[in-house]
Every structure is written in C-alpha cells, then in structure tokens.
C-alpha cells in the first residue's frame, strides 16, 4: 500500500516556529502578523486543569480580559517571560506556559477552562493557548526561533 503525504490544513496557512526561550511552546505564525501560541511538548498524562491567573496583578484571570477595536484597546502587553497559564496533569505534574515573545495578548483560549485536555489532544486548533499580535505594521518579532517541520497527513490509497 502506498500513501500520499499532505501538509495539514494548519500548516498550509501558518508557518510553525519554535521559541528561542522555551522548549514547551511553538508558534503558528500567520503572514498577517497574528501568532497563535500552542503547546509543543505534549504531556502523556491527561490535562485536568488550566489556570489563566497570575500571581502578579492580584491574580487577575487573563482569559477574562476584554480587547476591542482596531488598536486592540485593553489588550495586555506581554514580555518574553510573561506567564500565560499553568496547566495541571492527572499525574500531579504542573507546567507553566510563558509567552516567549514581546507582543500584545489579544485572546486567551477560555475553552480550556471547560475542556482542559484540548491542550493535549488538539493543540493546533481547539487547544491553542493564546493569540498574540505585535502592533501596527509589525509582522514578526524577536524571540521566535527556527522553522519547525510541518505536520504531515498520510492518506492510504
């Protein structure tokens, strides 16, 4: 049986980049300058909780932040070491996800509150962590590493 290999739908639209600072995240970078933060190293144990709170700013929940308008008024400014979320696995392990780039936090995936295992089972679509932009006219930022190989789909004929 011979099969054909095709790039996934996500990899046809976005370029997959590594983080220079953190090996547990990857970026799906769109040519428009929008970047989706996804998990790169998928834990084997089921994810049971995702916490978007932070110890700074009195534990504010990042997922409830409201962003509006063309200028993204109300968006949080991220530094490379800004914590996006912490997720806990069934085996008791806890993982911190940081931004890794300087940018503007447009959206957190609040779907992970009700279905936290999406971060493990569907990291490139329903389980994305955050959406980041970089300001007017900026398409890419420092902190993104090398291109990662695209995910391939194999169809049997």
Curated annotation (Swiss-Prot):
GO terms for molecular function: actin filament binding; actin monomer binding. Signal peptide: none annotated. One of its GO terms (cellular component) is dendrite. One of its GO terms (biological process) is regulation of filopodium assembly. PANTHER family: PROTEIN ABITRAM. This is Uncharacterized protein F54F2.7.
């Amino acid at each position: 049986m011979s099969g054909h290999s095709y790039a996934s739908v996500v990899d046809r639209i976005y370029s997959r980049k590594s983080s220079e600072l953190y090996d547990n995240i990857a970026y799906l970078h769109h040519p428009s300058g929008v970047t989706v933060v996804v998990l790169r190293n998928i834990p084997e144990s089921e994810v049971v909780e995702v916490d978007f709170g932070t110890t700074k700013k009195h534990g504010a929940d990042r997922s409830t932040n409201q962003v509006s308008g063309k200028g993204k008024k109300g968006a949080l400014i991220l530094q490379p070491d800004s914590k996006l979320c912490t997720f806990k696995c069934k085996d008791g392990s806890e993982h911190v996800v940081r931004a890794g780039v300087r940018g503007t936090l447009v959206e957190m995936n609040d779907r992970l509150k009700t279905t936290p295992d999406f971060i493990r089972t569907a990291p490139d679509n329903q389980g994305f962590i955050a959406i980041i932009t970089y300001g007017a006219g900026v398409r890419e930022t420092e902190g993104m590493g090398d291109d990662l190989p695209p995910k391939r789909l194999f169809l049997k004929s």
